[in-house]
């Protein structure tokens, strides 16, 4: 390797290591909630039999939980392992919205564990762990009608 190129590259690598940057992805701050597989994107997708519903960055259907009563997240512990909540990122401007998403309906609620969860029309958002690929909504009507996909207007899809 040419010595003149090695020095600047070495300085760049050293600066990144000392500065905490990464060429591949940003490092979360120590207090940041780690990004989950759910991502920080809310978009509108089509699900067979249901039509247009909210989906996450992976295209997985987002659901509301009827006992949440539009404002309080009541799915914790085992429930949250089965129905992972869509956690809110730390910082402004971190959530991306696809076409058809009404940004005025997006908010957050503090969960029992103190972490913020994204909401839509005051409904805390969840994914279903058994929805393995985009376009699935196998959690629709689950638990005797307590879980429903959520529409772009913010209502349950029946």
What is the meaning of each model-derived region?
Residues 10-20:
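Bacterial N-terminal signal peptides
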Residues 21-158:
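Compact beta-sheet-dominated domain cores in extracellular/mature segments
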Residues 1-11:
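Bacterial N-terminal signal peptides that target proteins for export
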């Amino acid at each position: 390797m040419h010595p003149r190129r090695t020095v600047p590259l070495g300085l760049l690598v050293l600066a990144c290591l000392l500065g905490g940057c990464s060429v591949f992805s940003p490092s979360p701050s120590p207090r940041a909630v780690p990004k989950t597989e759910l991502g920080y994107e809310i978009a509108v997708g089509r699900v067979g039999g249901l039509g247009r519903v909210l989906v996450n960055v992976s295209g997985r259907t987002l659901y509301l939980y009827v006992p949440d009563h539009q404002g309080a997240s009541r799915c914790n512990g085992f429930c949250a392992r089965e129905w992972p909540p869509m956690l809110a990122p730390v910082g402004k401007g971190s959530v991306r919205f696809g076409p058809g998403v009404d940004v005025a309906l997006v908010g957050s609620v503090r969960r029992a564990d103190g972490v913020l969860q994204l909401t839509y029309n005051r409904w805390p958002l969840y994914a279903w762990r058994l929805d393995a690929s985009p376009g699935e909504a196998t959690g629709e009507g689950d638990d005797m009608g307590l879980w429903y996909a959520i529409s772009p207007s913010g209502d349950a899809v029946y």
